[in-house]
Design a protein with these regions (language model features):
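Glycine/proline-rich active-site loop of Rossmann-fold NAD(P)-dependent oxidoreductases
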Residues: 141, 166-179
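N-terminal Rossmann-like NAD(P)+-binding domain of SDR-like oxidoreductases, especially those catalyzing
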Residues: 1-166
Length: 179
């Protein structure tokens, strides 16, 4: 989702800064595959959203934060729930606090349909009860609630997106739809 968002924002003429986790290969993930006219217009910064001072510094002079950083493997969340809390909850808190301190115009929180658990009614609406069926889902619920609290407590403009079963180009084979 993030690589498609970056591509679209660049094509619309926006300045884009993205934070990617440092890795030994210095890989930028899907950004490495972008055409030069897109890739050369992205400011890429390697770092960790769990580093509060780093995030505060890197979000200065930013108008909108699209927060997509998260650990997402549901099965692995059972093996390492602490890492999910650290990245998905504390990382989100760092992003929200930086947005507040740097007077960001809008904070877009990317969540997941997993926050609803098994559907209790169809169609699922925003009024559907939240039900964490995995440590991953619990961290995303916590992240969403933190975002809402920053709206309610600090009037930080927040938008929460909860995508369902995304698919398409650049899709991870982990989430491939069988044919």
């Amino acid at each position: 989702i993030g690589s498609h968002l970056i591509e679209k924002l660049i094509k619309l003429g926006h300045q884009v800064k993205t934070i990617i986790p440092y890795n030994i290969d210095n890989s930028w993930g899907w950004i490495d595959t972008f055409k030069p006219e897109i890739k050369n217009n992205i400011e890429v910064v390697s770092g960790d959203i769990c580093d509060q001072n780093f995030i505060l510094d890197e979000t200065k002079k930013i108008d909108i934060i699209f927060h997509l950083a998260a650990l997402i493997s549901i099965p692995y969340s059972y093996k390492s729930p602490q890492s999910y809390v650290s990245t998905n909850v504390m990382g989100t808190l760092n992003m929200l606090e930086a947005a507040r301190e740097n007077n960001v115009e809008l904070f877009v929180q990317t969540s997941t349909s997993e926050v609803y658990g098994s559907s209790q009614f169809i169609p699922i609406t925003e009024k559907h009860p939240l039900f964490a069926q995995s440590p991953y889902a619990a961290t995303k619920i916590a992240s969403d609630q933190l975002a809402l609290s920053y709206f309610n407590s600090f009037e930080l403009p927040v938008l929460i997106l909860r995508p369902f079963n995304t698919f398409g180009p650049r899709q991870s084979l982990r989430a491939a739809i069988p044919t």
